[in-house]
Amino acid sequence: MQPVLECEIFVENASGLELPELAIAPWENHLQRWLPELTAALPPADGYELTLRFTTDAEIHNLNHQYRHKDQPTDVLSFAALEDNFASPLPPGEPLYLGDIIVSVETAQRQAQERQHSLQTELGWLVSHGLLHLLGWDHPDEARLIEMLDRQAVLLRNVQLIP
């Protein structure tokens, strides 16, 4: 059994939609379960923090344009707070802020319908993808994308979002 890792998860619903799939507690629980499995490559810390924001196509379009120079909405954006050469130890008791995951609920709804699975499952794919990006994963080629998708599938199975 893994030791309990202190994780502070901030979940915001800015989508304007009141859907059971956007309830805060399940996402806090999923991220609390996923983080201890993924922290081996992170600098040691007494705990970790991140923000998950559910939003609209309009907001994610603006962010995608501002930060990635792509004038269109996207499904998920990640803004990692970690730097590659993170070397200085944190003060005792201070959590390490990992960054922000932003998910467009409108795009997730369309993709769930196209992929013929639930919105909850699609959100799981997007949130886990964003989390891996916060932790330094990337997919510059097909092989790395497959590796990332395989890892996401493990995470989703661990919280029963996929069989």
Swiss-Prot record:
Zn(2+) binds at residues 129, 133, 139. Single strand-specific metallo-endoribonuclease involved in late-stage 70S ribosome quality control and in maturation of the 3' terminus of the 16S rRNA. Pfam families: YbeY (PF02130). One of its GO terms (molecular function) is zinc ion binding. This is Endoribonuclease YbeY. It comes from Picosynechococcus sp. (strain ATCC 27264 / PCC 7002 / PR-6) (Agmenellum quadruplicatum). Its cofactor is Zn(2+). Gene3D superfamilies: Metalloproteases ('zincins'), catalytic domain.
